[in-house]
């Protein structure tokens, strides 16, 4: 209800203040009553002895001060010499005159206060017999105990009879006795009714009577506050009774009464704060309406420059009023949720204390209420924190606008630093509130999950009983096509809801981590800003600090460049010592090449026998008859491999076009390694072999082969495929062990140089190709993978680009400092609420 409607409904009613006649301090009053012969009336005089006593003390103090001033003036006149006065004494005399004038002004003010106090300390008036009776009737209306206390007054003639007979004559003795009785009566009336009422009856003044009345809006607010206090006292009484309850039945009944009392508390609080919010809501609506009218006038009407300027000033004024109303609404909202959240927390804590007094079976009857109360506590606290968050956001917005509106001046930079530090403090408070919000959201989810799990356990433990049937036909006849859902369907729905809540809790955890990182950035910026302010307070300029940072950066860059040059020199010396084409491949490329090479070797094994590699093979010393060449497949090998000497008389029978040789005797067998072949002595010159097969083109060519003698095909009995595979596995294990030892013992660059020196690496020229994305790499570092997953890219606004351009082109140091401060506070602040995936307030209603 608006205030205009209240005025229309409540017109004609007045509200008197309840304690308007209470006296804050008791004073001593004295009444003097005398008979005035000329007027024929009683002269009543009242003196406030308390005020008169204070005035007398004040007079004595003032007289003492005047005496000291007079003595000081006499001393100055005696010590002064008019004929020979020095300039210093002239200056001292000129300086003493203002102090004397000030003291005189104080004396005048004290005299005025004394005069007003004396006027308020004494009252006088003339009262006839009829006037005294009328005053007595008014005092009896206040307190009926005064009715028999008025002394007997003679009857006074009225009208024509007063002209004919005049005033009744009384003797002096009767008059004095009646005056004494009236003095006693007035003293008793003072004690019974109080000075405020008696003074207004006997000595009425012409002051405004508004002090005795109060506005109806204040009366209504007082009524709402009284209702709220009654609801609080009722709930507090029930909470006190809860401690003494020992039976579960009584406790459940008390819980229902507490719920009713809390409902009354919420209702009273809502009515009170709705009434308090109403004027601010009206002001906000009025301000928005007036601003809209001003906007329409500026857009549609043809106005002069003065009128346009006045409308703009009026618009700014209404905007300030609307902003003030919004801040007041937010503050009242915070107070409302503080009241409700505090009451629910007390109820929940008392219920947890009751849970420890009862067993699990007995407490099962109150589990639902406890879950409901826990959910309500988290929800109210969440709304309270969101209201506080809105208030802090408004303050941050005001600070940001003030920073943007700073003008050039002497204290502009200092004010900018102060505003930025204040912004960081508000942001840290906001982070604490946001952490509390996430905590309460997680508590809400936990309460819902506990309730769902309890419902699922109840569904699983539920026993369903069916009626018995005499025959299957009777069972089919009673089948209902529209059967209710089975417990399994209910459990599936509850499980689905549980998964949704678990996913939402995961998002809350991610938001916590994000806010934690932002808070660390804010703390770092705030610490730096405080250090800069302290350095500025001690007179330390920022220029040496910047110079030190630049020098440190230059030293770091020079150190990196020197290290790079040293590495290049080492590689150059290595190339000079070991000439040849060397290409260093990264670990990632080496792994890819090794996988590709292993795949090619497996493909070759499916087509032919395994290739001969450098290995130590142990064979039998006794010769064996060789199988025909068609029965044993020939082994293909690179040209760089050493040929094996023949055995016995099998050499004469070998065809001249044989590509491979047989194995030598065991006593002549040596370790053959293709990597160490340049260092070993060359074999005897064999005849030139035929051209290599096409499948061996991938192997790098080595030194041209020497002519060898034709040999027959070797027997599988001496060098079969299983022995070759075992030898290959041993070589791989040895190479991996050796490489791991070298990796642990030295740095990566030393490992590469040493391996190249001993010839264990066969390097080839790397091909330039686009590599596929690494499966082990995190998708968060790959923007293309993020785009494929559907991550939305935030569009850079044109205003931001223009602002950056302005900041880059601006030569004003204040403008650059403002932009830098805004950039820092933007880094320390979280992203907008529209970009995160936090659940809205409506999600918690389910």
Swiss-Prot record:
Residues 779-796 form the WH2 domain. It is a lipid-anchor. Residues 555-572 have a biased composition (Basic and acidic residues). One of its GO terms (cellular component) is cytoplasm. Keywords: Actin-binding, Coiled coil, Cytoplasm, Cytoplasmic vesicle, Cytoskeleton, DNA damage, DNA repair, Lipoprotein, Membrane, Nucleus. GO terms for biological process: 'de novo' actin filament nucleation; actin polymerization-dependent cell motility; Arp2/3 complex-mediated actin nucleation; cellular response to starvation; DNA repair; intrinsic apoptotic signaling pathway by p53 class mediator; positive regulation of apoptotic process. GO terms for molecular function: actin binding; Arp2/3 complex binding; microtubule binding; transcription coactivator activity. Residues 68-100, 472-494, 533-572, 598-717, 822-846 are annotated as: Disordered. The keyword Iron does not apply. Residues 601-619 have a biased composition (Low complexity). Residues 216-254, 410-513, 545-574 form a coiled coil. Residues 830-846 have a biased composition (Acidic residues). Belongs to the JMY family. This is Junction-mediating and -regulatory protein.
